[in-house]
Swiss-Prot record:
EC number(s) on file: 4.2.1.19
Protein name (database record): Imidazoleglycerol-phosphate dehydratase
Subcellular location: Cytoplasm
Record's keyword terms, sorted: Amino-acid biosynthesis, Cytoplasm, Histidine biosynthesis, Lyase
UniProt lineage: Archaea, Methanobacteriati, Methanobacteriota, Stenosarchaea group, Halobacteria
CDD domains, per database record: IGPD
Length: 195
């Protein structure tokens, strides 16, 4: 199997970001975004997706968390697309429902090369520490659009911490499933011959 790793950087007036990703890792992570709860979610994403992930971000948190969260989604999406290469042999489709106490998140993904994003639900509280709850949706959208994913997400619950954490874990599990190499397949999983 080819090496399915990638690294990317992004530097703007708002953020300076470095990300590395290994799709065939062990779930190890080193994350420093400046937002404690977001660090926790990215660590959970790596752990439950079995991705090795490093994220370092110096963002304009004196303003708010928007640019940091959005730009990390962009760079992680770029890394995901780069690590997948021509997508030869991948499973392509996956879905996962993950509960956390009263909350449940459903994720359906197609590693299609046709970026689309759909979200259903609302977070129960506007903030989790210094993290704006709705930025979880925005992170997933930025990831999907830059990785070339068709991504459908839905959440239900009563506690925003649980809702967001279930969402990150379901996203990780579904991406692990969809990006996994199927030994029975040597071609790209599309009748078109490419994704």
């Amino acid at each position: 199997m080819t090496d399915r790793t990638a690294a990317a950087t992004r530097e703007t007036a708002e953020t300076e970001i470095e990300v590395t990703l290994d799709l065939d890792g062990d779930g190890e992570s080193t994350v420093d975004t400046g937002i404690g709860f977001f660090d926790h979610m990215l660590e959970a994403f790596a752990k439950h997706g079995l991705f090795d992930l490093t994220v370092r971000c110096d963002g304009d948190l004196d303003i708010d968390d928007h640019h940091t969260v959005e730009d990390i989604g962009i760079v992680l999406g770029e890394c995901l697309a780069d690590a997948l290469g021509d997508k030869r042999g991948i499973v392509r489709y996956a879905d996962r429902a993950v509960p956390l106490d009263e909350a449940v998140a459903d994720v359906v993904v197609d590693v299609s090369g046709r970026p689309r994003f759909y979200f259903d639900g609302a977070f129960s509280q506007p903030y989790i520490g210094e993290f704006t709850s709705d930025m979880a949706r925005h992170f997933a959208e930025s990831l999907a659009l830059n990785a070339g994913l068709t991504l459908h997400l839905s959440i239900e619950g009563e506690n925003a911490h649980h809702e967001v954490e279930a969402l990150f874990k379901a996203l990780a599990r579904s991406l692990d499933d969809a990006t996994r190499v199927d030994d029975r397949r040597s071609d790209t999983p599309s009748t078109k011959g490419e994704l």
